[in-house]
Each structure stands twice: as C-alpha cells, then as structure tokens.
C-alpha cells in the first residue's frame, strides 16, 4: 500500500491485507481488512498504532519513504494487529517513547515483552505537544478491551478511534466514498466485535458527540470525512430499538427438525414477520451475528444428539450468548428419538441473554399434525409479543 495523505500533517502508513480471510482464527473476513497506522508530523513526530506483525515490513518501508524519525509511538490498544510491530519500530528508533495508558502498558509488557523504561504513561485528558500540534488522550474502556483509548489531534480535529467505528474491509479508498459500500462491513464488524459492549459504547458515543471532529480515522477500513455517517449507524445499533424479525439458526440430521423449521418459517411469514434462517452446517457466522443486531427474537432449532443438542446448535447458542444482542425474546424448537436434555442445555448456554423465554417446542420423531399446531402457537406468541412492542 502506498503512503496516503490524510491532512497536511497526518499520513496513513499502514497496510491493506487483501487476502486475509480469518481473524482471531474465528471471524470470517470475506472482504479482507486493513491495519491502519498514522504518522503525525510536527517538530516531533508521532506514530499512532502500528500494524499486524505479518505486515511489519510494509510499515517500516513507509516510514523510511517518509524520511521521518519517530519520537513517540501512541498505542491506543494492545491487540497485536495494532501493537505487533511496536518492537520493530522501537528497535529502529532507539530514542522513541511508547505512549499509552497504565492498563495498556501492562498488556504490552506481558504480550510483547517491551521494557518498562520505554513507556510514557498518560491518563484521560492528558495531552502531548508535538510542536504546533497537540494530541489529546481519551480513555475508552470497554468500547472494546479494558485498555482501549482514543487519540484526538486537536488542531486538525482528527479522531484516531482505534478499533471503534472501524470495518474489516480491504479497499483502495482512503475515505468512505459510498456509504453503501461500507455499510455491510461496518455493521458486520460491529456485530462480531463491538456488540457485547453496547452499553459502554453508548457512553462513548455521547463523549464523541460533545467533541468537534472532522475526520474519524479508525484502525481498520476507510476513514470518514463525515463522522455522523458512522456514529449515526452506531447510535441505531446500540439503541434498545428492535425490528419485527426472527433469527433462526438451525441444524437437522435426518429431516425431522428441518420439517419443523420449514413449517415455522412459513408460519412466521404468514404473520408478517421477517425471518432470517441460518443452516448452521454452512452458515457464515458473521452474517448470523449481523442478523442479531436488530432482531426482536431468536429461535434455535436442533435435533438431539445422544442426550444433548447438536454441536452446531451449541455453538450458535454460545455465540448468541457471547454477543449479547438486544433481542427481547428467545425460544427453542427441535426433535429427539428417545430422550435427553437438549432444551435444558441450550437454555443454560444462553444465560447472558436478557430475554423472555417463550415455550419451546420439542417433538419425538418426525413432527405430526399436532406438533405443527404447537409450532403455529409459538408463531402466534411471537406475533403477539412483537405487536406489544409496536413492531
């Protein structure tokens, strides 16, 4: 990636990873990603975050091309896709100081073995004067990790927001040119990474609303010249508002649960409810996570394997529980051959959800006409609950 000018004193010196398809050995990356790092030039020069260690060579080449001496590295976040090249930068610039907060210092020392004497510690509201330019540090715990912070370039009104407001999107565009292009990756990123911290994010959005910000420069994806484009979407996603939607992760072994799912989908459609089914044997978990951002209800469908739920259903329940979406209702449908505790175990897997659990539907063998009536009753109950929310 070439060096790109953000403002008169800010340069993007990070890396685009066009080929990466999995993050944290967990999150699919259908659109690749980028690791954004920024140089702020003045009498002193600051490097804001670094890049994934697989791309260290690109970062170092960009710094050499700019012909700068790095006086300060600002570490907004300790995760290695942003901090992993810090050791190489410290090695290249021996007098460089590593500027971060106390919690981030601890993590960086533990994860990257950085010597304590390299650190310069800042707290919320502290500033670093580079010359004519001033960096202000804003603590943002649990917008992602407990040590996350933002850096604000006062004179040019640039917010370096780290992972917050980012998107896993490999693009040659420095700035968002078409919101339609970035909406899906940004929402997917929020769903997979940020949604568990919804309550904390609300507070940090209020902080940003009180600031004069002209450019949002995240650590992944393109930058925003109109910050309200991305903050407005986040305000919607973190609100308590839900939509007339049911998310339906399912798996079926011999067709019984699939027959229930197909009937349930039809019953929901007949009642004017949007349904989003995900066959867990092939589903993209990022798409499943995205669907949970807005939905009022989630229903997991599973057969019984030995005495418990199918492992794919367990994974779906664990994912829903970990992401803690704002859905209001949940239920379980499925089948069994001779017994088991499928429903009970799935319930236990979703204890983080602050939802009303609607009566599950569990059938023995292939569903009968009476079983389909029970599924219709569940669809009726969901319709009623959604109407009570004016959906």
Regions found by a protein language model. Give the residues of each.
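Conserved beta-strand hairpin/beta-sheet module of binuclear metal-dependent hydrolase folds
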Residues: 3-65, 150-153, 157-160, 257
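Metallo-beta-lactamase
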Residues: 4-8, 100-148, 200-203
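Active-site metal-binding motif and surrounding structural segment of the metallo-beta-lactamase
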Residues: 43, 54-99
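Active-site neighborhood of phospho(di)ester-bond hydrolases with catalytic His/Asp-centered motifs
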Residues: 48-50, 70-78, 98-101, 159-162, ...
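Short acidic active-site motifs
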Residues: 85, 284-288
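Active-site-proximal loop/helix segment associated with metal-binding centers of metalloenzymes
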Residues: 144-148, 164-196, 237-242
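FMN-binding flavodoxin-like domain, especially the glycine-rich phosphate-binding loop
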Residues: 171, 181-216, 221-222, 263-276, ...
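Short, charged N-terminal beta->alpha structural module
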Residues: 249-271
């Amino acid at each position: 990636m070439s060096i790109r000018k953000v403002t008169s004193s800010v340069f993007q010196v990070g890396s685009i990873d066009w080929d990466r398809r999995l993050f944290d050995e967990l999150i699919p990356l259908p659109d690749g990603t980028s690791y954004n790092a920024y140089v702020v030039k003045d009498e002193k020069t600051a490097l804001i975050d670094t890049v994934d260690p697989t791309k260290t060579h690109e970062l170092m080449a960009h710094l050499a091309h700019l012909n700068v001496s790095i006086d300060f590295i600002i570490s907004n976040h300790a995760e290695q896709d942003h901090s992993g090249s810090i050791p190489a930068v410290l090695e290249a610039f021996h007098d460089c100081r590593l500027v971060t907060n106390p919690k981030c210092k601890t993590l960086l020392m533990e994860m990257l073995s950085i010597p304590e004497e390299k650190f310069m510690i800042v707290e919320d509201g502290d500033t670093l004067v580079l010359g004519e330019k001033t960096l202000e540090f804003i603590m943002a715990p649990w917008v992602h990790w407990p040590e996350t912070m933002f850096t604000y370039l006062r004179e040019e009104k640039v917010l370096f927001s780290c992972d917050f407001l980012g998107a896993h999107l490999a693009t040659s565009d420095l700035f968002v040119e078409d919101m339609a292009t970035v909406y899906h990756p940004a929402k997917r990123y929020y769903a997979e990474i940020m949604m568990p911290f919804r309550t904390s994010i609300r507070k940090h959005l209020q902080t940003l609303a009180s600031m004069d910000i002209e450019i949002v420069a995240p650590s992944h994806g393109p930058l925003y010249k109109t910050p309200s484009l991305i903050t407005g979407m986040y305000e919607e996603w973190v609100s308590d508002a839900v939509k007339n939607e049911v998310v339906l992760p399912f798996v079926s072994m011999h067709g019984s649960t699939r027959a229930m799912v197909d009937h349930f989908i039809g019953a929901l459609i007949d009642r004017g409810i949007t349904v989003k089914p995900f066959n867990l044997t092939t589903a993209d978990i990022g798409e499943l996570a995205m669907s949970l951002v807005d939905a009022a209800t989630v229903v997991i469908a599973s057969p019984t394997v030995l005495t418990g739920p199918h492992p794919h259903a367990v994974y779906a329940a664990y994912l829903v529980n970990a992401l803690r979406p704002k859905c209001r209702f949940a239920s379980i449908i499925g089948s069994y051959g001779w017994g088991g505790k499928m429903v009970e175990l799935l319930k236990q897997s979703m204890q983080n959800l602050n939802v009303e659990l609607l009566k599950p539907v569990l059938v023995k063998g292939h569903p009968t006409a009476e079983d389909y009536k029970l599924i219709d009753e569940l669809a009726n109950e969901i319709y009623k609950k959604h109407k009570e929310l004016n959906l």
